[in-house]
Regions:
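Basic, amphipathic alpha-helical segments enriched in Lys/Arg and hydrophobic/aromatic residues
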Residues: 335-338, 342-371
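Short, basic/hydrophobic alpha-helical segments
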Residues: 38-56
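Gly/Thr-rich phosphate-binding beta-strand-loop-beta motif of the actin/hexokinase/Hsp70
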Residues: 2-23, 105
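Phosphate-backbone recognition surface of nucleic-acid-processing proteins
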Residues: 229-232, 238, 242-343
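Glycine-rich, often acidic, oxyanion-interacting loops/wings at catalytic, nucleic-acid
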Residues: 135-227
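Short alpha-helix plus adjacent loop in nuclease-associated cores
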Residues: 81-118, 276-284
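Short glycine-rich, Thr/Ser-proximal phosphate-binding strand/loop in the N-terminal lobe
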Residues: 13-40
Length: 371
């Protein structure tokens, strides 16, 4: 006789683990609460359910990540991480607490109403954390640079007005201009910019270290072929390809590009009824890192679809099956972008539409590798 399944919903926080255990095809379960230690919780459940049961745990995807999943599976129990945004909600249910959350998870899990998420390997998770840290450092550096430019404007130092052109900030020319301004500045301003410059240089050094490590990782066997498939796209270099690969994971789990579009939050919100159609902005209910990289890569939609010097260099020794998909993508988003632009669509909307198109081709390229 097979063991009965015990469905266990977990609500996890820093202070307590709340659990609700319910036997399959039964209506009443039992609540548990323990200190934040999964082994203590499992011990409590086993003391209550002394018969032989197969434990099926589930919990929402939260800040706890995959650590709890690996702790549970390590001791021989099954565990599923649930997509929090896809948990069914009742409009009349206005009471929420940890105990009820755990109960709802257990009941919905037993009825098969929950959607599991993809679990990466430990190596993929660690590499993704490294890549995200590099993005975090880069964002920090941008904020400090913006702060420095704001201070200059408060002091009446306007670089673009002085140079009589729309020059970019933080070029060598801009740095030389700033040094000249600081010669006659007060001691407080000199001290302020000395610290700011040290911060910017320190973050630049950290960025270089991260990027060197990412380039080294890109040569590993599990990433090398995927990198080749992506760097033949215009607008995607090795660093951008590493971000896409680590964030997308195994693309075979997406049976159609539309599902990948939803995962990236590039779907268009729609509220249509009867003969009336209402479409709004993109949902943004998905991976922001993928959206950002693709939008940046799609900036070149209005350029003539030709293979430039840098792209030709990146495409050396890459199989034709990858370059063929990338070329189709380049021509497609150029045609699509021009069409939307001539219709008078806002530039940012055009870029987003091109990014959505591009994601479908990337799905095809990565599936060529995995298949």
């Amino acid at each position: 006789m097979e063991n009965k399944i015990l469905f266990i919903g977990l609500d996890v926080d820093n202070k307590n683990y709340h659990a609700h255990a319910i036997v399959e095809n039964e209506n009443v379960g039992i609540d548990f609460r323990s200190k934040p230690n999964i082994h203590s919780l499992i011990k409590m459940i086993k003391e209550k359910f002394k018969e032989n049961y197969t434990f099926h745990f589930c919990y929402e995807s939260t800040y706890s990540g995959y650590f709890l999943y690996r702790e549970i599976t390590k001791v021989g129990h099954e565990c599923t991480i649930i997509a929090a945004s896809l948990i069914p909600e009742k409009s009349g249910d206005k009471v929420k607490n940890d105990r009820l959350d755990a109960e709802k998870l257990a009941i919905y899990f037993m009825k098969g109403l929950l959607t599991p998420i993809y679990i990466p390997t430990e190596t993929d998770e660690q590499v993704r954390a490294l890549v995200r840290s590099r993005t975090f450092i880069k964002d920090q550096q941008k904020e400090i640079k913006k702060h420095a430019v704001a201070i200059c404007k408060q002091l009446g130092w306007n670089y673009r007005q002085d140079e009589k052109e729309s020059s970019s900030y933080w070029t060598q020319k801009h740095k030389n201009w700033l040094k000249e301004k600081l010669i006659t500045a007060s001691e407080f301003t000199k001290f302020n910019f000395k610290i700011i410059e040290a911060q910017i240089n320190d973050l630049e050094e950290r960025l270089n270290q991260y990027e060197c490590e990412m380039r080294r990782i890109s040569e590993l066997p599990e990433y090398k072929e995927k990198i080749k498939a992506l760097i033949c796209y215009r607008g995607i270099d090795i660093l951008s390809a590493m971000i896409l690969i680590t964030e997308l994971g195994d693309t075979r789990r997406f049976s159609h590009p539309k599902k990948l579009t939803s995962y990236a939050g590039l779907d268009i919100r729609e509220y249509s009824s009867g003969g009336q159609q209402r479409k709004y902005s993109i949902t943004k209910m998905g991976n922001k890192f993928i959206r950002k990289i693709l939008t940046e890569a799609a900036q070149n939609y209005n350029r003539i679809p030709v293979i430039g010097k840098d792209l030709r260099t990146r495409r050396q020794n890459i199989e034709p099956k990858y370059t063929e998909v990338a070329d189709r993508c380049m021509h497609r988003i150029h045609k699509r972008g021009k069409h939307l632009w001539h219709r008078g669509i806002a530039v940012n909307k055009v870029k987003t539409a091109c990014a959505r198109e591009m994601l479908g081709f990337i799905w095809e390229s990565l599936n060529l590798v995995t298949n």
